[in-house]
Protein backbone atom coordinates (compact mmCIF):
# COMPACT_ATOMS: atom_id res chain seq x y z
CA UNK A 1 0.00 0.00 0.00
CA UNK A 2 2.90 2.39 0.70
CA UNK A 3 4.13 1.85 -2.85
CA UNK A 4 0.62 2.48 -4.14
CA UNK A 5 0.36 5.76 -2.22
CA UNK A 6 3.79 6.87 -3.41
CA UNK A 7 3.02 6.18 -7.07
CA UNK A 8 -0.35 7.85 -6.71
CA UNK A 9 1.30 11.00 -5.37
CA UNK A 10 3.55 11.07 -8.43
CA UNK A 11 0.58 10.69 -10.77
CA UNK A 12 -1.53 13.34 -9.11
CA UNK A 13 -1.66 16.76 -10.76
CA UNK A 14 -2.74 19.89 -8.96
CA UNK A 15 -6.30 20.62 -9.99
CA UNK A 16 -6.90 24.11 -11.31
CA UNK A 17 -10.46 25.13 -12.11
CA UNK A 18 -10.75 26.96 -15.43
CA UNK A 19 -10.84 30.73 -15.33
CA UNK A 20 -14.13 32.46 -16.03
CA UNK A 21 -15.01 32.83 -19.69
CA UNK A 22 -18.14 33.96 -21.48
CA UNK A 23 -20.24 31.08 -22.84
CA UNK A 24 -20.73 31.59 -26.57
CA UNK A 25 -22.20 28.34 -27.93
CA UNK A 26 -24.10 25.17 -27.02
CA UNK A 27 -20.94 23.05 -26.94
CA UNK A 28 -19.38 25.31 -24.33
CA UNK A 29 -22.67 25.50 -22.41
CA UNK A 30 -22.76 21.70 -22.29
CA UNK A 31 -19.25 21.61 -20.89
CA UNK A 32 -19.85 24.29 -18.28
CA UNK A 33 -23.27 23.03 -17.18
CA UNK A 34 -21.68 19.61 -16.87
CA UNK A 35 -19.03 21.18 -14.68
CA UNK A 36 -21.80 22.19 -12.26
CA UNK A 37 -22.58 18.48 -11.79
CA UNK A 38 -18.97 17.84 -10.85
CA UNK A 39 -18.82 20.81 -8.49
CA UNK A 40 -21.94 19.66 -6.65
CA UNK A 41 -20.11 16.46 -5.71
CA UNK A 42 -16.70 18.04 -5.25
CA UNK A 43 -18.02 20.43 -2.63
CA UNK A 44 -19.54 17.62 -0.57
CA UNK A 45 -16.37 15.56 -0.88
CA UNK A 46 -14.24 18.45 0.32
CA UNK A 47 -16.64 19.10 3.21
CA UNK A 48 -16.32 15.49 4.38
CA UNK A 49 -12.55 15.46 3.98
CA UNK A 50 -12.36 18.66 6.02
CA UNK A 51 -14.31 16.91 8.78
CA UNK A 52 -11.62 14.21 8.77
CA UNK A 53 -8.80 16.81 8.73
CA UNK A 54 -7.37 15.38 5.50
CA UNK A 55 -5.25 17.77 3.41
CA UNK A 56 -6.87 20.77 5.20
CA UNK A 57 -5.22 23.52 3.14
CA UNK A 58 -6.04 21.91 -0.21
CA UNK A 59 -9.53 20.98 0.94
CA UNK A 60 -10.33 24.50 2.15
CA UNK A 61 -9.11 25.88 -1.17
CA UNK A 62 -11.28 23.36 -3.01
CA UNK A 63 -14.33 24.48 -1.05
CA UNK A 64 -13.74 28.15 -1.79
CA UNK A 65 -12.73 27.74 -5.43
CA UNK A 66 -15.52 25.28 -6.19
CA UNK A 67 -18.23 27.47 -4.65
CA UNK A 68 -16.96 30.51 -6.54
CA UNK A 69 -16.81 28.57 -9.81
CA UNK A 70 -20.32 27.19 -9.29
CA UNK A 71 -21.74 30.68 -8.84
CA UNK A 72 -19.80 32.10 -11.78
CA UNK A 73 -20.98 29.30 -14.06
CA UNK A 74 -24.57 29.96 -13.06
CA UNK A 75 -24.17 33.62 -14.00
CA UNK A 76 -22.63 32.73 -17.37
CA UNK A 77 -25.28 30.10 -18.12
CA UNK A 78 -28.06 32.56 -17.30
CA UNK A 79 -26.52 35.08 -19.69
CA UNK A 80 -26.21 32.42 -22.39
CA UNK A 81 -29.82 31.30 -22.00
CA UNK A 82 -30.93 34.92 -22.45
CA UNK A 83 -29.00 35.13 -25.72
CA UNK A 84 -30.64 32.23 -27.57
CA UNK A 85 -34.13 31.63 -28.92
CA UNK A 86 -36.68 29.28 -27.35
CA UNK A 87 -34.73 29.12 -24.11
CA UNK A 88 -37.61 29.11 -21.62
CA UNK A 89 -36.98 25.50 -20.53
CA UNK A 90 -33.29 26.28 -20.05
CA UNK A 91 -34.11 29.30 -17.91
CA UNK A 92 -36.45 27.24 -15.74
CA UNK A 93 -33.76 24.57 -15.31
CA UNK A 94 -31.19 27.18 -14.32
CA UNK A 95 -33.61 28.76 -11.84
CA UNK A 96 -34.14 25.36 -10.21
CA UNK A 97 -30.38 24.89 -9.89
CA UNK A 98 -30.13 28.35 -8.35
CA UNK A 99 -32.76 27.51 -5.73
CA UNK A 100 -31.01 24.26 -4.82
CA UNK A 101 -27.68 26.04 -4.71
CA UNK A 102 -28.91 28.65 -2.24
CA UNK A 103 -29.83 25.90 0.26
CA UNK A 104 -26.59 24.02 -0.37
CA UNK A 105 -24.37 27.09 -0.10
CA UNK A 106 -26.02 28.17 3.14
CA UNK A 107 -25.07 24.91 4.86
CA UNK A 108 -21.59 24.81 3.32
CA UNK A 109 -20.83 28.33 4.54
CA UNK A 110 -21.68 27.68 8.19
CA UNK A 111 -18.11 27.77 9.37
CA UNK A 112 -18.82 27.50 13.09
CA UNK A 113 -21.07 24.44 12.93
CA UNK A 114 -20.54 21.19 11.06
CA UNK A 115 -23.64 19.82 9.35
CA UNK A 116 -24.29 16.06 9.54
CA UNK A 117 -22.85 14.11 6.62
CA UNK A 118 -26.32 12.99 5.58
CA UNK A 119 -27.43 16.62 5.23
CA UNK A 120 -24.50 17.49 2.98
CA UNK A 121 -24.95 14.35 0.90
CA UNK A 122 -28.67 15.01 0.42
CA UNK A 123 -28.08 18.62 -0.62
CA UNK A 124 -25.33 17.61 -3.02
CA UNK A 125 -27.58 14.98 -4.60
CA UNK A 126 -30.50 17.37 -5.04
CA UNK A 127 -28.20 19.90 -6.65
CA UNK A 128 -26.77 17.19 -8.89
CA UNK A 129 -30.24 16.17 -10.11
CA UNK A 130 -31.04 19.78 -10.99
CA UNK A 131 -27.74 20.19 -12.85
CA UNK A 132 -28.25 16.91 -14.72
CA UNK A 133 -31.60 18.17 -16.00
CA UNK A 134 -29.98 21.27 -17.49
CA UNK A 135 -27.24 19.26 -19.20
CA UNK A 136 -29.76 16.89 -20.77
CA UNK A 137 -31.82 19.82 -22.07
CA UNK A 138 -28.73 21.39 -23.61
CA UNK A 139 -27.78 18.11 -25.29
CA UNK A 140 -31.32 17.87 -26.68
CA UNK A 141 -31.08 21.45 -27.93
CA UNK A 142 -27.79 20.69 -29.70
CA UNK A 143 -29.36 17.85 -31.75
CA UNK A 144 -25.96 16.33 -32.57
CA UNK A 145 -24.53 12.93 -31.70
CA UNK A 146 -21.21 14.60 -30.96
CA UNK A 147 -22.89 16.59 -28.17
CA UNK A 148 -23.43 13.31 -26.36
CA UNK A 149 -19.68 12.91 -25.93
CA UNK A 150 -19.37 16.34 -24.32
CA UNK A 151 -22.09 15.32 -21.88
CA UNK A 152 -20.74 11.83 -21.23
CA UNK A 153 -17.10 12.83 -20.79
CA UNK A 154 -18.15 15.73 -18.58
CA UNK A 155 -20.22 13.35 -16.50
CA UNK A 156 -17.07 11.30 -15.83
CA UNK A 157 -15.69 14.34 -14.02
CA UNK A 158 -18.75 14.26 -11.78
CA UNK A 159 -18.42 10.53 -11.16
CA UNK A 160 -14.78 10.91 -10.13
CA UNK A 161 -15.88 13.32 -7.41
CA UNK A 162 -18.99 11.35 -6.51
CA UNK A 163 -16.85 8.26 -5.96
CA UNK A 164 -14.51 10.27 -3.73
CA UNK A 165 -17.51 11.75 -1.89
CA UNK A 166 -19.13 8.40 -1.13
CA UNK A 167 -15.80 6.82 -0.21
CA UNK A 168 -15.19 9.71 2.18
CA UNK A 169 -18.67 9.26 3.67
CA UNK A 170 -17.86 5.62 4.40
CA UNK A 171 -14.52 6.57 5.94
CA UNK A 172 -16.06 9.30 8.10
CA UNK A 173 -19.08 7.33 9.28
CA UNK A 174 -17.55 3.87 9.43
CA UNK A 175 -20.82 2.64 7.92
CA UNK A 176 -19.94 0.88 4.67
CA UNK A 177 -23.41 -0.64 4.24
CA UNK A 178 -25.06 2.78 4.16
CA UNK A 179 -23.10 4.15 1.21
CA UNK A 180 -21.58 1.16 -0.56
CA UNK A 181 -24.44 0.62 -3.03
CA UNK A 182 -24.12 4.21 -4.23
CA UNK A 183 -20.35 3.89 -4.47
CA UNK A 184 -20.52 0.68 -6.48
CA UNK A 185 -23.15 2.20 -8.78
CA UNK A 186 -20.90 5.20 -9.46
CA UNK A 187 -17.95 2.90 -10.19
CA UNK A 188 -20.11 0.87 -12.58
CA UNK A 189 -21.36 3.99 -14.37
CA UNK A 190 -17.79 5.21 -14.79
CA UNK A 191 -16.75 1.84 -16.27
CA UNK A 192 -19.64 1.78 -18.76
CA UNK A 193 -19.20 5.40 -19.85
CA UNK A 194 -15.44 5.03 -20.26
CA UNK A 195 -15.96 2.10 -22.63
CA UNK A 196 -18.56 4.10 -24.58
CA UNK A 197 -16.12 6.99 -24.94
CA UNK A 198 -13.34 4.67 -26.07
CA UNK A 199 -15.67 3.34 -28.78
CA UNK A 200 -16.84 6.78 -29.95
CA UNK A 201 -16.55 7.18 -33.75
CA UNK A 202 -15.77 10.88 -33.25
CA UNK A 203 -12.49 10.27 -31.43
CA UNK A 204 -9.30 11.76 -32.78
CA UNK A 205 -5.97 10.01 -32.24
CA UNK A 206 -5.23 12.44 -29.42
CA UNK A 207 -8.57 11.76 -27.71
CA UNK A 208 -7.87 8.03 -27.93
CA UNK A 209 -4.44 8.60 -26.41
CA UNK A 210 -5.93 10.58 -23.53
CA UNK A 211 -8.65 7.99 -22.91
CA UNK A 212 -6.07 5.22 -22.79
CA UNK A 213 -4.26 7.14 -20.04
CA UNK A 214 -7.51 7.50 -18.11
CA UNK A 215 -8.21 3.77 -18.45
CA UNK A 216 -4.78 2.97 -17.03
CA UNK A 217 -5.25 5.39 -14.13
CA UNK A 218 -8.78 4.12 -13.50
CA UNK A 219 -7.69 0.48 -13.29
CA UNK A 220 -4.91 1.53 -10.95
CA UNK A 221 -7.36 3.44 -8.77
CA UNK A 222 -9.53 0.40 -8.22
CA UNK A 223 -6.88 -0.94 -5.86
CA UNK A 224 -8.15 1.64 -3.39
CA UNK A 225 -11.70 0.30 -3.65
CA UNK A 226 -10.44 -3.23 -3.07
CA UNK A 227 -8.79 -2.13 0.17
CA UNK A 228 -12.16 -0.81 1.35
CA UNK A 229 -13.70 -4.21 0.70
CA UNK A 230 -11.03 -5.68 2.95
CA UNK A 231 -11.95 -3.27 5.74
CA UNK A 232 -9.15 -0.77 5.11
CA UNK A 233 -10.12 2.86 4.48
CA UNK A 234 -7.67 5.02 2.50
CA UNK A 235 -9.50 8.32 1.81
CA UNK A 236 -6.26 10.21 1.12
CA UNK A 237 -5.36 7.79 -1.68
CA UNK A 238 -8.82 8.04 -3.21
CA UNK A 239 -8.68 11.83 -2.88
CA UNK A 240 -5.46 11.92 -4.90
CA UNK A 241 -6.35 9.36 -7.56
CA UNK A 242 -9.75 10.90 -8.28
CA UNK A 243 -8.09 14.31 -8.61
CA UNK A 244 -5.84 12.90 -11.32
CA UNK A 245 -8.79 11.35 -13.14
CA UNK A 246 -10.74 14.60 -12.83
CA UNK A 247 -7.91 16.54 -14.45
CA UNK A 248 -7.63 14.08 -17.32
CA UNK A 249 -11.38 13.95 -17.94
CA UNK A 250 -11.54 17.74 -17.88
CA UNK A 251 -9.00 17.86 -20.71
CA UNK A 252 -10.92 15.22 -22.66
CA UNK A 253 -14.22 17.06 -22.22
CA UNK A 254 -12.62 20.19 -23.66
CA UNK A 255 -11.48 18.14 -26.66
CA UNK A 256 -14.99 16.79 -27.22
CA UNK A 257 -16.35 20.32 -26.88
CA UNK A 258 -14.06 21.42 -29.71
CA UNK A 259 -15.11 18.42 -31.85
CA UNK A 260 -18.79 19.15 -31.30
CA UNK A 261 -18.42 22.85 -32.03
CA UNK A 262 -16.54 22.05 -35.25
CA UNK A 263 -19.34 19.72 -36.37
CA UNK A 264 -21.87 22.46 -35.69
CA UNK A 265 -19.92 24.95 -37.82
CA UNK A 266 -19.63 22.44 -40.66
CA UNK A 267 -23.35 21.65 -40.50
CA UNK A 268 -24.34 25.32 -40.67
CA UNK A 269 -21.79 26.43 -43.28
Which ranges hold each PLM region?
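Heptad-repeat alpha-helical coiled-coil/4-helix-bundle sensor or tether segments in soluble regions
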Residues: 62-119, 126, 187-232, 240, ...
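Extended amphipathic alpha-helical interaction segments
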Residues: 117-205
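Positively charged n-region of N-terminal signal peptides that target proteins for export
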Residues: 1-5
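Hydrophobic faces of stable alpha-helices that mediate helix-helix packing
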Residues: 33, 37-40, 67, 74, ...
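N-terminal signal peptide c-region/cleavage motif recognized by signal peptidases
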Residues: 13-18
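C-terminal amphipathic alpha-helix
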Residues: 117-146, 227-269
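N-terminal extracytoplasmic segments of bacterial inner-membrane proteins
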Residues: 24-55, 144-175, 243-253
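Structured alpha-helical bundle/scaffold domains in large eukaryotic membrane-trafficking regulators
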Residues: 51, 55, 171, 175, ...
Amino acid sequence: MKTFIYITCLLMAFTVLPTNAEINNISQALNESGRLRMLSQRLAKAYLLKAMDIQPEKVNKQLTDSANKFEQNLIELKAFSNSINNSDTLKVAIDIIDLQWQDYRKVLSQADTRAPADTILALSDRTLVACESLVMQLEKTAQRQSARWVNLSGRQRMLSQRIAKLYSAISLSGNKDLYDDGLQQAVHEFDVALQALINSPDNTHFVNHKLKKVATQWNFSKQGFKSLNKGNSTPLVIFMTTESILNQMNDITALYEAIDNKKKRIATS
